[in-house]
Regions:
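Glycoside hydrolase catalytic-domain context in secreted enzymes
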Residues: 1-686, 692-708, 712-713
């Protein structure tokens, strides 16, 4: 390959660059390829990757035509017949394909604590993405949800490193399968490597300050697990850590990712991020220097995505001048071609939707509904208010009650998720689903998200109801448009909540939101709190079934739900992070804790057993517990194992999740659940940035059962 061809493989453009536009510069719908623009990019500049949709979701035949045209040009009109690698953000289903199955978002999938659900959802997503003729998916997000202000919090698996690592593995397994040449699977992309998810301000793409030890302890492990699972690509963090943009950080991109983790795939930038080294981060005085910095640091592919000529010309010149070695170029291109070969794109550059007859079928809808059911978290149920009798008169109010938008969130049919009501018109809003379950349902919105509409009307209607279903939360958003100044739920919604409480009727609060908006002003006054996060297209039905008692809720919180805006502490905090003002004793008082969540069945935990209380070396600690369903309904239960290190050279966390299993129990049934731990499971990163095990005393805890062990060297 010539240098120009190699640089082309490292260049990624957005579909908008090569489609036809009208006289006003708007993309023609449905989108069509502009042959002249396409040939300039693919033939003249040898561009190797195309991404994105054309503003909104496309039907299968449109995707088929677009990608067939692109691939035919790449395979027939370029010297080496190298296929294009087409990528898409299909983060909770094939969300840019009309009619596809849209699952709960990642934060809601995390609430299931169910590896199999996550894997199955990913496998169906892969199937429907390949039905769209697309072989590469920009998912999963493996950043840690430890900054609840962040506008991409809902794209994470929550705040716990172990949970994110395990569910990340499951999602990659579902996406990639065992054979990527099987055209029902896609290449996964772990993102956003590394540290992107904890900006100090809480605002997207703003700087993070994360000490190296914490970076390795909390933020690196999910990416390490993904590499072990065989993930093929990674997208790089758009922000900076400790003053250095990650796109220019050779230690993180080459030293850790490619050498220490032995990552074999390639690293792609996020949107325009090489440009931002010059225009936003101000570490590169010119665009030329920005390209040099990024490629030398270890970037293999640039999501340009518009000015591809400039990127290519600058990189070619940098190689010719010796400022970027051809060896670095060869490494990048080898990695890119490796992924294309693993996907079998030379043999099957195009997949045809006619061969995917399961697309959006009943089997996939059933899987989606089960995921949504397990994602809903019952956090409060005073006096067993739920389930409601279906003969009761229900009044429904709030901004999230009658729209598909808050059920799905961002990355749903369009970038910001604002068109879900248009594209998902055949799906049920929560209000519509409640009307299916209950005979007598009335409705008044009361407020928009942040402004009052008709609170007095809502209060009057509520007075004649048996119960109020109060639907609060957030509209859809993604990335920087979702930045907020305050976690407290908007004042208009607070006023609506107060008005409903004043009626004296039982209030069932439903929260549809992408991050934990603070509700402490009225949380103590409502009888029920159901947190659904972003449960997807089947979320309305799942919530309604839980309210009516058809389904027993089983979700658990994958993050700490704060009580106060200035007390954002994770469950695995150090004891010194939560001290009282007086004697310095621990005080951790969130609205709800990580792992909280109840059902209609009472689960009794007994007989916590250990095979040994004193262990040495590479021995295995075997832990078991008996769980009995004391209720009258079948129920699912997420069993969580926590470990506390009593003393360590680095201040230990008060507890850490080290195992979880999801089980199903019939009424009266007892199951024994077992876990195994090795020394490595109790290791941590020390002050020298080495992962070490220190012998000593530990406690293992499942629910309220706790036992202490000693582990010697």
């Amino acid at each position: 390959m010539t240098l120009e061809e190699k640089v082309g493989q490292m260049t990624q453009i957005t579909l908008e660059v090569i489609v036809k536009k009208d006289i006003e510069g708007e993309i023609i719908r449905p989108p069509e390829i502009d042959s002249e623009k396409m040939r300039k990019a693919l033939v003249d500049y040898h561009v190797g990757s195309v991404i994105n949709t054309s503003g909104a979701a496309n039907p299968l035949p449109v995707w088929q035509k677009l990608i067939t045209t692109i691939q035919n040009t790449a395979m027939q009109e370029t010297p080496h017949h190298i296929p294009i690698l087409y990528g898409i953000d299909a983060i909770h289903g094939a969300n840019y394909t009309t009619g596809a199955t849209l699952f709960p978002q990642q934060i809601a999938q995390a609430a299931t604590f169910n590896r199999k659900i996550v894997e199955n959802n990913a496998a169906i997503t892969a199937y429907e993405v390949r039905a769209s003729a697309i072989p590469w998916n920009f998912s999963p997000v493996l950043g840690m949800g430890r900054q609840p202000l962040w506008s991409r919090f809902w794209e994470t698996f929550g705040e716990d490193t172990y949970l994110a690592s395990e569910l990340g593995r499951a999602m990659i397994k579902g996406y990639q399968g065992t054979d990527l040449k099987d055209t029902t699977h896609v290449a996964a992309c772990m993102k956003h490597y590394l540290g992107y998810s904890n900006p100090r301000t809480g605002k997207d793409r703003t700087p993070a300050a994360i000490p190296d030890r914490e970076l390795r302890q909390y933020y690196l492990p999910p990416f390490r697990a993904a590499v072990e699972e065989g993930v093929l690509t990674t997208m790089v963090c758009s922000g900076e850590i400790n003053g250095t943009p990650v796109h220019a950080n050779k230690t993180i991109l080459t030293g850790i990712l490619k050498k220490e983790l032995d990552f074999k795939g390639f690293a792609v930038t996020d949107w325009e991020d090489i440009i931002y080294l010059h225009t936003r981060h101000k570490v590169a005085p010119t665009m030329r220097e920005a390209v040099k910095m990024a490629v030398n640091a270890g970037i293999d592919m640039s999501m340009v995505p518009f000015k591809y000529e400039e990127f290519a010309d600058l990189l070619i010149d940098l190689v010719k001048s010796g400022e970027v070695s051809e060896e670095r170029i060869n490494d990048a291109v080898t990695r890119i071609l490796y992924v294309k070969k693993k996907l079998g794109l030379w043999e099957t550059p195009i997949t045809h939707y006619e061969g995917y007859n399961k697309f959006a079928g009943d089997e996939f809808k059933k899987t989606n509904l089960e995921a949504a059911r397990e994602a809903v978290i019952l956090l409060k149920n005073t006096n067993s208010t739920l389930p409601l009798d279906t003969k009761q008169k229900i009044f429904v109010t709030g901004p999230t009650a009658n729209s598909m938008v808050p059920l799905n969130g961002g990355w749903s049919y369009n970038w910001q998720g604002t068109r879900a009501d248009e594209f998902a018109e055949n799906e049920q809003t929560l209000l519509e689903a409640l009307r299916d379950q209950f005979a007598n349902v009335s409705y008044e919105p009361g407020v928009d998200y942040d402004k009052e509409i008709s609170i007095s009307n809502a209060k009057r209607k509520a007075a004649s109801a048996d119960a109020v279903v109060l639907c609060l939360g957030e509209s859809s958003y993604c990335e920087t448009p979702g930045n907020i100044e305050d976690l407290v739920i908007p004042e208009a919604q607070q006023k609506l909540a107060s008005a409903m409480v004043e009626t004296g009727k039982p209030v069932i609060l439903i929260l549809l939101e992408g991050r934990p908006r603070i509700v402490s002003h009225f949380a103590d006054d409502v009888e029920v709190i159901l947190l659904a996060n972003l449960p997807g297209n089947m979320g309305g039905r799942a919530i309604a079934e839980i309210i009516s008692g058809k389904i027993n809720p089983s979700g658990k919180l994958p993050y700490t739900y704060p009580r106060f805006a200035n007390h954002l502490v994770t469950y695995d905090h150090k004891g010194t992070q939560a001290l009282t003002k007086t004697d310095g004793s621990p005080e951790f008082n969130p609205q709800f804790e990580f792992g909280d969540g109840m059902g209609y069945a009472a689960f009794d935990y007994t007989n916590l057993s250990l095979n040994k209380r004193i262990l040495e070396g590479d021995e295995t600690l075997e832990i078991s517990v008996d769980i009995t369903n004391q209720g009258k309904m079948e129920g699912k239960e997420a069993v969580l194992l926590f470990v506390t290190d009593h003393f360590a050279s680095i201040t230990p966390a008060v507890k850490q999740l080290k195992g979880f299993q999801k089980i199903t129990l019939a009424p009266g049934e007892t199951q024994k659940v077992s876990f195994s731990l090795k020394q490595s499971d109790l290791s941590f990163v020390n002050k020298d940035l080495k992962t070490v095990f220190e012998p000593g005393a530990f406690s293992v805890q499942i629910e309220q059962l706790k036992k202490e062990i000693q582990w010697k060297k």
